[in-house]
């Protein structure tokens, strides 16, 4: 974790995007000492593959690394307590006609197997002396051809000062897209903008006035005065539906196998690559008796947790994982005594096997030193052409035991 904190400090020396108050109040501004030692980190919005990623995503990632989940969610919408993925989408097109703004996003990267918890529309605006309402129409577009109307809201984005980034809660609009796909009814969202440094997000409320979607005109005058596609971002906080991953299939395996950035050639060159199978055991603990334990292998250390540094560059994943570049996953090694005791937190099955081993040594093999408690890891990486912040479960060994 010390490495993570050191590497990620650069983001706060060069932040240019605002964050909602629930994040801002919990992210300390650090000095530039780390950046000076690592000049390559100063250009924080570009990866070594020359692909951009938003500063906001880096800020969010670092906040999750430095703060626990309870502190992160306190005072904010309870929906943020439940997300496991954050996806950022830059606008594909920004158009205007009088007091109407038309914003188009490619929602193809959004998984229909995910449940939307929170959606933020973040718009960067210049500091100007102006105050008038604007109707914002939000569309889904794919390859510049398909235009699906998602909804509209009315706001006065110039009415407040502070951060140039104005944030609007558009969860209600996009929930229809997540639930109904193409069958979306027109909704009208009215919102009163508040400064990002105030409540963190504009309040919003729907009016019962559904109707036909506004006429989409690709020849509208581009918003050269106010907006650019790089200054309009949709941030989606989602969670995979329980039924999708009910088997417990490791989420990172699926992600890595589908990534176009994984260097499989490097992996194939590594010597001694073999496939291993491991047993799945019950996780019910049993209070041990007073039978004295003995060592199976004289002189071999007992079951314990040891370091295992995973460097993503070394395993060919460096081109798609933004952060962390490496982390300590830990591993378990050592011998398990016969019979097992409470110190090694065995399952019922493992304890019975150790007792059989004590009395009938040739009948069963020795219990194995394995992880019994795991913790997740937050990772920022490219998924397709988008940047995703995702929490992958069972990435770090917290405790070892015998099974």
Curated annotation (Swiss-Prot):
Glycosylated residues, per the record, are 68, 133, 169, 341
What residues form the membrane-spanning segments?
A: none
- UniProtKB keywords: Cleavage on pair of basic residues, Cytokine, Developmental protein, Disulfide bond, Glycoprotein, Growth factor, Secreted, Signal
- Please list where the region (Disordered) is annotated: 195-220
- Any Gene Ontology CC annotation: extracellular space
Key word Chloroplast present: no
Biological process annotations from GO: axial mesoderm formation; axis elongation; determination of left/right symmetry; heart development; involution involved in gastrulation with mouth forming second
UniProt lists the family membership as follows: Belongs to the TGF-beta family.
Name listed for the protein in its UniProt record: Nodal homolog
